[in-house]
């Protein structure tokens, strides 16, 4: 496994979980519509650029949307500072009131593959699929930072068949299972050899940079669970969506 998916805050000793996918959140964009210089200059603030009004997708996730807003403002996505969270809320309200975004979930994948919007917030694995389907699409991670995430398998304490569960985890982690899983959905495998083979010469995702998570940016973070902040952000995101519906 890659070092980047080991020793994470939720399992620092790697005792309870086995990662199988990992990646980032970033911006998928149509290279025929979006100037890369705009992305490099504005980062997430491109979602406030009137040039792209009515031509953007937001992802219906309070966690990722607030990550985007907080990073656009120069803050940590793990902040519990009330004033910073309020600023991020105001940023998102400004976005939905002035930019007329479409707030979506998984439909962003096929829609961006078909070039229906100029840009959107997306998971790197979904961006890999989009770019694999449409060569006019690109993936950009702002220098201000992003969420570096991983998906992992765990076994509940009350599991009825832990031996079978361990066997499945072993299968999903070994080369063949990990290769099939990653190549089918486009999400980056935590298995080093699988990742190398899928990205390398002749691989399914050869040359698609979205498939290679960024590991060298000091502003990238792993989410830390905070129950109170989670509740607050969830409530504020509901208000953002109400503001969006009232605007539309």
Region roles according to the model:
Residues 147, 151, 156-218:
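Mature extracytoplasmic/periplasmic domains
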Residues 113, 119-136:
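A ligand-binding cleft/hinge motif common to bilobed small-molecule-binding domains
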Residues 1-113:
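Extracytoplasmic ligand-binding site segments that recognize negatively charged/polar headgroups
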Residues 49-53, 70-75, 93-97, 113, ...:
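Sec-exported extracytoplasmic/periplasmic mature domains
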Residues 108, 126-127, 177:
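Alpha-helix capping/helix-boundary segments
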Residues 11-14, 129-141, 203-206:
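Ligand-binding "clamshell"
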Residues 86-95, 133-157:
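Periplasmic-binding protein-like
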Residues 110, 213-248:
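Conserved C-terminal helix/tail region of periplasmic/extracytoplasmic solute-binding proteins
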């Amino acid at each position: 496994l890659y070092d980047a998916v080991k020793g994470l805050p939720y399992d620092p000793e790697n005792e309870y979980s086995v990662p199988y996918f990992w990646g980032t959140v970033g911006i998928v964009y149509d290279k025929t519509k979006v100037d890369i210089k705009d992305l490099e200059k504005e980062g997430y603030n491109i979602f406030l650029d009137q040039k792209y009004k009515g031509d953007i997708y937001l992802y219906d996730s309070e966690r990722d949307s607030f990550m985007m807003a907080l990073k656009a403002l120069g803050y940590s996505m793990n902040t519990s500072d009330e004033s910073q969270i309020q600023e991020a809320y105001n940023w998102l309200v400004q976005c939905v009131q002035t930019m007329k975004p479409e707030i979506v979930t998984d439909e962003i994948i096929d829609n961006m593959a078909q070039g229906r919007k100029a840009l959107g917030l997306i998971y790197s694995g979904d961006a890999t699929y989009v770019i694999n389907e449409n060569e006019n699409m690109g993936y950009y991670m702002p220098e201000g930072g992003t969420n570096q995430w991983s998906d992992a398998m765990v076994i509940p304490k009350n599991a009825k068949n832990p031996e079978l569960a361990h066997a499945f985890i072993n299968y999903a982690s070994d080369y063949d299972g990990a290769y099939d899983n990653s190549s089918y959905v486009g999400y980056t495998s935590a298995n080093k050899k699988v990742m190398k083979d899928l990205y390398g010469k002749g691989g399914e995702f050869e040359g698609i940079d979205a498939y290679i998570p960024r590991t060298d940016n000091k502003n990238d973070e792993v989410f830390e669970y905070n129950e109170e902040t989670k509740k607050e952000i969830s409530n504020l995101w509901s208000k953002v969506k109400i503001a969006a519906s009232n605007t539309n």
